Amino acid sequence: MNIYAVGGAIRDELLGVPVQDRDYVVVGATPEQMAAQGFRPVGKDFPVFLHPRTQEEYALARTERKTAAGYHGFQFHYAPDVTLDEDLARRDLTVNAMAREVSPEGELVGPVIDPFDGQADLRARVFRHVSDAFVEDPVRILRIARFAARFADFTVADETLALMRRMVDAGEVDALVPERVWQEIARGLMEAKPSRMFAVLRECGALARILPEVDALWGVPQRADYHPEVDTGVHVMMVVDYAAKQGYSLPVRFAALTHDLGKATTPADVLPRHVGHEGRSVDLLKPLCERLRVPNECRDLALVVAREHGNLHRVMEMGAAALVRLFERSDALRKPARFAEMLQACESDARGRLGLDAQPYPQAERLRVALAAARSVDAGAIARGIGNDTEKIKEAVHRARIEAVAQALEIGE
């Protein structure tokens, strides 16, 4: 048998970026031979094995044939006579269809095996499909978009983009399972330039199918005195990229993506103002999260940011009572870590505007000081002093928090 490192590891090595995971293909072996050498089978649809020492994945060389719509509609063929070139031919992009042989000691040896000119496309910074079989797997649309977010200086070849459009028009994207769509969107959000992912998805028409609420934001005007970039879609991409540049968490980046969804449904006769867009954003966000089965942590932060971001921007005008009500609505007193992420999302919103990425955001420090003061109130001591009257306790604690915030900020109630 011969073992080869394949795919992203070879690509990243040639690009000079850190290799995170290595995938291996085994040519000339059977499942029985792999098991005899201590490899543990883990593949459900085709033979994949874990190395007995490193626990890395090794797959038998295979070919595949489309048999039904969607991500799972494939029939796989694996046998000792399947060649490395045949295995590489089923891969999505030329830059991912390269290999190097692995020695018995686990070292990469010999030249790069590159039957589809992936090295030339790497130099040209182009994502190009290996063959027309690309159209058989709709996940590849999401993968290319995610790669664009990681390698922001790459472009998609015209002929590849044409295939992607054909797949979208044929309804292939509609057959994707929600969990896989979310997985790829989430991974793309965590890349260096998430806006590139959404640009590619828009260009091929896929964004309108998988995230129509986001796609609808382009072309919606905002007030130029607040938003020099004017276009809401452009603004949201700037917000997401700012959050990515700061290294913020996935929940923060998802909240950045979805905070202004309601602007797409603003009545045309009131544009470019967007009064009440926060509530409309929440109304759109709830079914989106349900449809894609967004994890609770991401959903909950996104909902509270969508609802409250306008209020957070206006905190310099608020008295102590309004600030305490904001903390209570946002559950900040019980969940200060989540509130810190709210601040990150709102700061990204404020700085995700043309020419304003270094704009001061004093609201964040004011809210941090105010929340610390509100949380310093000893609710237990107040309760012990009052007794069993729950309503009186609640009112007294609320009043004490207002007084603490007013004192900390030296403002009126």
UniProtKB/Swiss-Prot annotation:
GO MF, one annotated term: cyclic-nucleotide phosphodiesterase activity
GO biological process: RNA repair; tRNA 3'-terminal CCA addition
Subunit structure: Monomer. Can also form homodimers and oligomers.
SUPFAM superfamilies: Nucleotidyltransferase, Poly A polymerase C-terminal region-like
Comment field on protein domains: Comprises two domains: an N-terminal domain containing the nucleotidyltransferase activity and a C-terminal HD domain associated with both phosphodiesterase and phosphatase activities.
InterPro entries (alphabetical): CCA_bact, HD_domain, NT_sf, PolA_pol_head_dom, PolyA_RNA-bd, tRNA_CCA-adding_enzyme
Function description: Catalyzes the addition and repair of the essential 3'-terminal CCA sequence in tRNAs without using a nucleic acid template. Adds these three nucleotides in the order of C, C, and A to the tRNA nucleotide-73, using CTP and ATP as substrates and producing inorganic pyrophosphate. tRNA 3'-terminal CCA addition is required both for tRNA processing and repair. Also involved in tRNA surveillance by mediating tandem CCA addition to generate a CCACCA at the 3' terminus of unstable tRNAs. While stable tRNAs receive only 3'-terminal CCA, unstable tRNAs are marked with CCACCA and rapidly degraded.
Listed cofactors: Mg(2+); Ni(2+)
Name listed for the protein in its UniProt record: Multifunctional CCA protein
Domain annotation HD: ranges: 232-333
Pfam families: HD, PolyA_pol, PolyA_pol_RNAbd
Record-annotated disulphide pairs: none
NCBIfam families the UniProt entry points to: PRK10885.1
Keyword Membrane tagged: no
E.C. numbers: 2.7.7.72, 3.1.3.-, 3.1.4.-
Remaining remarks: A single active site specifically recognizes both ATP and CTP and is responsible for their addition.
Residues binding CTP, per UniProt: G8, R11, R91, R143, R146
Cofactor stoichiometry and binding remark: Magnesium is required for nucleotidyltransferase activity. Nickel for phosphatase activity.
Entry superkingdom: Bacteria
